[in-house]
Amino acid sequence: MRVLVISQQFSPEMGALPNRLYPLTRHLAEHGHEVFVATGMPNYPRGEVFPDYRGRHFMRERRDGAIVLRTNYYTTARNVSRRAQLLSYLSFLPAVLHSGWRAGRVDAVFVTSPPIFPAVPAILLAKLHGAKLIVDLHDLWPDEIVAVGAAREGSAPIRVLRAIERWMYRSADVVTCTTRAFADTVAERGVGEEKRRLLPNGADVELFRSLPRENGIAAQYPFGDRLVVMYSGLLGIKHGLETVIEAAALLRDREDVVFFLRGEGPRREALEAQVRELGLTNVLFGGERPIEEVPYVLARADVCVTNLLPDPYLDKIVSVKVFEYLACEKPVVGGLRGEGARILEESGGGIAVEPGDAHAMADAVRGLLDSPEQRAEMGEAGRRYVVEHRSRAVIAARLEELLAEVTSRHNGS
């Protein structure tokens, strides 16, 4: 089977989307399928092309068996103007058409959304190749844009995105969703049961695992012998990480505790300013690390935290970081409702509090820090849940079965 994967981000970039896709493409290649990835030059999240890829218009490389076709496009960081971001999204479309065309005839086109714009060349390439189209929803656009206040429902940009969304759903042979709530939403938008499939998020349990608390990578940070409350991932708008900073302020009396936010994103400068304004000395920031080093950083955490803004749309999502925390045997305190809260409860690996409630988050964190036994029990339960239900290997095998089903229908067998 020949499969074309289309994504604006891909390894060696870091983030939820590359972390979801890379194990999927690796699994397909290891099982004898020809996998092509049409993408751009790696630049996420800073918008600066990585050093080894600069000065090139097109390049072809192999990553764990997958043939990665990269074309240069206009790149920009997330914290610049919306016009610059839109230009970046739009410039990717001819780039991915170029890369996708070079892949030659394929049996299936697998495109991830968001961003939603690559669905346009994906639809065209699927038609040109006579291939089946699988649309993979790891978030919902334009719902997320409205949820974080970046645009108003009914505005001209959102109307355009809604039109692309409708075309994408009509054109897809299968729509895969990371959560049940997403599947329910697309059902309401006319995607029939025969098209909908659940392809949830998870973690690479061989990479994200329990490691020695004291290790050379974690030792690069000035934690000392303090207990560490850690957030690891994108410092984005939808995460409402001001709540984590406020929780740190409520625990400033604990000299044995430090909060650590590891990652980059459009809210980092604002969060650092918040820490300065509050005069906090118990909050540290750290930038991106290669994905293979992240579990060693997480190993130093005593409690992991996450949060999402209190919005009905965001109740439908579960961040990849939640599964990575659990896989590393870390107890989780999440400012989460809906799907995220359900995962914490179902796994037994965490405590859900109301999004944006810094007092509740601080109380839950304090309780776990004061109970090593509870932390250990939650850590073991969380790891067990991910291994049994949300391993990337299990999810990749599910995708392989789905592709076989779809392409066999295509071939009339």
Residue ranges and their predicted role:
Residues 181, 202:
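Carbohydrate-associated surface elements
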Residues 223-248, 260:
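Conserved donor-binding/catalytic core segment of Leloir-type glycosyltransferases
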Residues 303-306, 324-335:
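Short hydrophobic beta-strand element within catalytic cores of glycosyltransferases
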Residues 1-64, 411:
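N-terminal subdomain of nucleotide-sugar transferases
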Residues 187, 193-194, 203-219, 240:
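Acidic anion/phosphate-binding donor-loop and adjacent secondary structure
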Residues 97, 117-120, 124-129, 155-177:
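Membrane-proximal helix-turn-helix segments that form the acceptor-binding/catalytic region
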